[in-house]
Regions:
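Acidic, glycine-rich segments characteristic of secretory precursors and extracytoplasmic regions
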Residues: 2, 8, 23-78, 101-103, ...
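Long, intrinsically disordered, low-complexity segments
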Residues: 23-24, 118-121, 193-195, 218, ...
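An aromatic- and glycine-enriched ligand-binding surface/loop that stacks and positions planar moieties
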Residues: 24-90, 199, 225-228, 233-435, ...
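Conserved, well-structured interaction surfaces
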Residues: 40-53, 57-67, 87-164, 178-192, ...
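Short coil/turn linking the two alpha-helices of tandem helical-hairpin repeats
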Residues: 161-162, 166-168, 209, 237-246, ...
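Flexible, polar/acidic helix-loop-strand segments at domain edges
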Residues: 362-489, 737, 742-762
Length: 762
């Protein structure tokens, strides 16, 4: 029988909001409700553009979207189900939880439902495409609008392709009736379609974005370069082990030749490695790159925001809350985000090599610099200091967090993060399960051992912040922030070319591209940009170095989960055949062994704090007292009222001034000393007062035994949920996942080996 898919049956009705955003307020405010309109609107450029803007609104990745908004949910570095499947965040996601097995036939522990939530926006884009094609607009106007619309539809299909391996390809508006069927295309057909659509989009947009460019008011729209960059990402995905189980070399060669040929066109659209020739001090050029708004050359595919206040008429507020979420509580932030011990400990050392204590990517040369976990800030990659924040580090901002209800010790321009903790019960000093601690400087119970600092609008690198700082009202703190999020950065364009070059056995070119990435971060030719000397002659080592570089460069950007999936890093791919899927025969049958990567299964992630040494901890219950400052008072109170043990004369004997003299200033302007000298000074403070304490991250079982991550090989391609199967009885279930119409026995459809769409099978 012919296997077909009922697209109409699951189309959801979209609640159309009145706004969409971009870096330009004019672009934002033009996103009106153009959803329910007649075909006449397409005969006017403004009307057709309004419909296109609605497609942008429902399609662009949105850092504020969550699991309930699958059509825009693209894991932009949040502590979500994707990132919690990687080294970046603790807490088992449903994919790696050893106590949960995802399934597609019951109401609990269900597989992700990304499939069904996508079709309403695809239908919306198809309606827009048909309306523009049938309009009386000029050919140049049609090309400009259709090039964008085809890209947005392809973006939707790309997300489905990478998760499910293959999908139905619906390119016209269908009536929502059972007779409207579209077969499921196999993986090869989907790949060919995606690349063809992006080539078409790129060509349509050439006149507007290569020969010319978008105005500042249209910044955020896609370009020919955006189309090609996404195509290159898809080509790398197609060549990777997830889709390329036999390691077909022609896929790597094709990707390499195509990307190398087309990267000049991407450059012609105005894209490039931001601050490539201005690395600044201690990674400042790299950090500043994330804060550019209009005409940021790094931003190849970007989602834009504004810093509008709420309750305006009309309300065009579209804020990026990341800055608010990562800032500590004593800055009026949301208490911050916490990295795992794993991600902190694996960042490269100052010489660019992996720490010798990191037992993964062992094909890559280890550093000769000893890693000291008690002082993790010593001798690290410049990006470490811009990705994480630790006790004793300036992290300045534009604002004053002292209010009538929040009496904090610093104004923003002088802010130092002091997030060490203490306990009032000796039984908790080294108790991994206990987080009953109190933090310095009014952090009290709202404290973390280290903070994620990535993307932060640091006053040291951006004198004109992208946020409004508020001490009252609905948007307290940093909520009104317009920092953009970049789904595709130019750094990825280069690293995609590097990966393709390595796969095509052009390791010398791959290494040259790595050098450009490293130079922007602050490395120099003096030590070969921190790269091992053997990469040009060892393909496995070169590929491992590229993936390691991606992990560091793109930490907390929502890229790691997909890299781990496409390179089968959870188990090396050894479980595929057992799940009924096509076995891995390339890369020696195990990508983890090939790369020297320690399989993620069997590992766990914890966190840590820096607590005061035993002699400085309370035993009299004083720790939890109210912080002894009042509004507008930044002076230190008497010892007897200060709950911080080391700021009491009879214990630590420090004052705030003497403590602050240990703080590290990455700009090297407040503390006029080189970073290495400052870090040695801070190390002295740690040696005198602090000790690193491990605290529970991932779950323990009922017997308080630490659990480790698991992975089912069928998760590499996702199955369709029970609801999706009920709505589409002819939809073939993915191999290894329960088939509702076969009483829960496993599906047999493998996207990689399935016959082309429309093929009749018995």
């Amino acid at each position: 029988m012919k296997r077909i898919f009922n697209i109409g049956a699951i189309c959801l009705t979209m609640a159309v909001a009145a706004t969409m955003s971009s870096c330009s307020d004019e672009f934002i405010q033009d996103k009106k409700n153009y959803s329910n309109v007649s075909s006449e609107i397409y005969n006017y450029y403004s009307g057709a553009n309004g419909r296109l803007n609605e497609c942008y609104r429902i399609t662009l990745p949105n850092i504020q979207a969550g699991a309930s908004q699958m059509w825009q949910y693209n894991s932009l570095g949040m502590a979500d189900n994707h990132s919690q499947s990687t080294e970046e965040y603790r807490n088992f996601s449903t994919f790696v939880d050893p106590q949960v097995t995802l399934n597609t036939v019951t109401g609990t522990s269900g597989a992700p439902g990304y499939f069904g939530s996508s079709w309403s926006r695809i239908r919306e884009i198809n309606e827009t495409i048909e309306g523009i094609q049938g309009s009386t607009l000029s050919d140049s106007e049609k090309d400009e609008l259709l090039g964008q619309a085809f890209f947005l539809r392809t973006w939707c299909y790309y997300l489905l392709f990478r998760y499910y391996g293959s999908i139905p390809l619906v390119t016209e508006v269908q009536n929502p009736v059972p007779e409207s069927f579209t077969p499921r295309s196999n993986a090869q057909e989907c790949y060919d379609f995606l690349c063809s659509e992006l080539d078409k989009s790129a060509e349509m947009l050439k006149k507007r974005t290569v020969e010319s460019s978008w105005s500042a008011n249209d910044w955020g729209r896609v370009t020919t370069g955006t189309c090609l960059a996404l195509k290159h990402r898809i080509m790398i995905l197609w060549a990777s082990p997830l889709f390329n189980r036999d390691n077909d070399q022609s896929r790597w060669t094709n990707a390499y030749n195509t990307i190398k040929q087309e990267i000049g066109t991407i450059n012609a659209c105005g894209y490039g490695l931001a601050n490539e020739n201005a690395p600044g001090v201690n990674g400042s050029g790299w950090a500043k790159m994330f804060l550019g708004i209009v005409n940021n050359p790094e931003a190849v595919f970007v989602s834009c925001y504004n810093k509008n206040t709420p309750d305006l008429t009309p309300d065009y507020q579209r804020n990026n809350l990341w800055e608010q979420q990562i800032r500590p509580a004593n800055t009026l932030g949301n208490n911050g985000k916490t990295p795992t011990d794993m991600i902190v400990d694996l960042f490269p050392m100052k010489d660019g090599k992996r720490p010798a204590t990191y037992d993964s990517y062992t094909k890559v040369e280890a550093s000769a610099i000893a890693y000291d976990a008690e002082h993790p800030f010593m001798n690290r990659d410049p990006r470490f200091y811009r990705t994480f924040a630790f006790p004793g580090e300036y992290w300045r901002f534009n604002g004053d967090p002292n209010t009538s209800t929040s009496a904090n010790p610093y104004t923003g321009d002088k802010y130092i993060l002091w997030n060490y903790v203490w306990y009032n019960d000796p039984a908790n000093f080294d108790n991994v399960m206990s987080s009953d601690h109190f933090g310095a400087d009014n952090l009290l119970t709202s404290v973390h051992g280290m903070y994620i600092r990535k993307f932060s609008d640091d006053l040291d690198v951006n004198a004109t912040p992208n946020y409004n700082f508020n001490t009252a009202g609905k948007n307290v703190g940093f909520r009104e922030c317009m920092t953009s999020t970049m789904e595709i950065r130019y750094a990825e364009v280069l690293l995609n070319l590097a990966e393709a070059a390595c796969g095509a056995n052009q390791m010398g070119e791959a290494v040259d591209l790595l050098k450009r990435i490293r130079a922007r971060a602050g490395y120099t030719a003096d030590n070969n940009y921190g790269l091992p000397a053997n990469l040009t002659g060892d393909q496995a080592a070169c590929m491992a170095a590229i993936l390691y570089e991606r992990q560091i460069e793109f930490a907390y950007e929502g890229k790691r989960f997909e890299d781990m999936r496409r390179w089968l890093l959870f188990d090396g791919g050894v479980g595929l055949a057992g799940a009924g899927a096509k076995a891995l025969t390339g890369w020696g049958g195990n990508t983890c062994t090939y790369l020297g990567f320690k399989p993620f299964v069997g590992q766990r992630r914890d966190e840590f704090v820096f607590r005061l040494q035993n002699k400085y901890n309370y035993t009299d219950g004083q720790s939890g007292r109210t912080w002894p400052f009042t509004a507008g008072d930044n002076t230190e109170k008497k010892d007897e009222t200060n709950p911080d043990p080391i700021l009491k004369s009879n214990m630590g004997g420090l004052t705030r001034a003497t403590r602050d003299a240990y703080a590290v200033d990455l700009s090297e302007t407040i503390v006029n000393k080189p970073l290495d000298e400052q870090l040695e000074n801070l190390k002295t403070f740690y040696d005198t007062y602090l000790v690193r304490k491990k605290i529970k991250g991932d779950a323990y079982d009922s017997n308080n035994t630490p659990l480790t991550m698991s992975w089912n090989a069928r998760y590499y391609f996702w199955g369709f949920t029970q609801g999706e199967q009920i709505n589409n009885p002819n939809l073939p279930q993915v191999v290894g996942w329960e088939d509702y119409y076969k009483s829960g026995s496993n599906g047999t459809y493998d996207p990689l080996t399935a016959e082309p769409a429309g093929t009749t099978t018995e």
